[in-house]
Amino acid sequence: MIAIYPGRFDPVTLGHLSVARRASGFCDRLIIAVFDNPAKPGLFTAAERVDLIKQSVKDLPNVEVHSFSGLMVNFARRMGVSLIIRGLRVGADFEREMEMYVMNRRLDEGIELCCLFSEPQYQYLSASLIKEVVMLGGDSSGLISEHVADALKNKLASA
């Protein structure tokens, strides 16, 4: 089975990576798909986010990382995907994922959704919260990988 784990990953967190690692255990092939939205540019470019994730999952042989723009369902169809993986942190995530599930099923009935609950230590972790903590000089250890922390500090210093 080929699955896709889509997101912005700006930057990728240990919560994201936990979901990816767990999903890779039950998929033949997992595609981490970095959403590149020109209308809403992130701190990191799509290429930078792809590179940071590739460094983070290099020990997972069945995981690949790509960027995409446009509808995720169209990208998933092109990649032969049959399952969307999403991580759920808090209740608001469930509502948002349900909305997306209904729309994705309308666009392509052949793609299913699998939601994985975040591990407890990542329940309230978000990329935007991490950016704020690092920008204000806080410690990001245990929240993002060391190479991501270095890239984030460098990016914020040059912004």
From Swiss-Prot:
Keywords of the record: ATP-binding, Coenzyme A biosynthesis, Cytoplasm, Magnesium, Nucleotide-binding, Nucleotidyltransferase, Transferase
Record-level GO BP terms: coenzyme A biosynthetic process
Transmembrane segments: none
Location of this chain's protein in the cell: Cytoplasm
Sequence positions that bind substrate: 40, 72, 86
Site feature (Transition state stabilizer) residues: 16
Cofactor(s) the protein needs: Mg(2+)
Enzyme class: transferase
Keyword Isomerase: no
Residues that hold ATP according to the record: 16, 87-89, 97, 122-128
Any one GO cellular component localisation term in the record: cytoplasm
Pathway: Cofactor biosynthesis; coenzyme A biosynthesis; CoA from (R)-pantothenate: step 4/5
Enzyme Commission code(s) on record: 2.7.7.3
Pfam families in UniProt: CTP_transf_like
InterPro entries referenced in this protein's UniProt entry, alphabetically: Cyt_trans-like, PPAT, Rossmann-like_a/b/a_fold
Gene Ontology MF: a single term: pantetheine-phosphate adenylyltransferase activity
Chief place where the protein resides: cytoplasm
Highest taxon above the source species: Bacteria
Subunit composition and interactions: Homohexamer.
Function statement: Reversibly transfers an adenylyl group from ATP to 4'-phosphopantetheine, yielding dephospho-CoA (dPCoA) and pyrophosphate.
HAMAP family from the UniProt entry: PPAT_bact
Assigned protein family: Belongs to the bacterial CoaD family.
Protein name as annotated: Phosphopantetheine adenylyltransferase
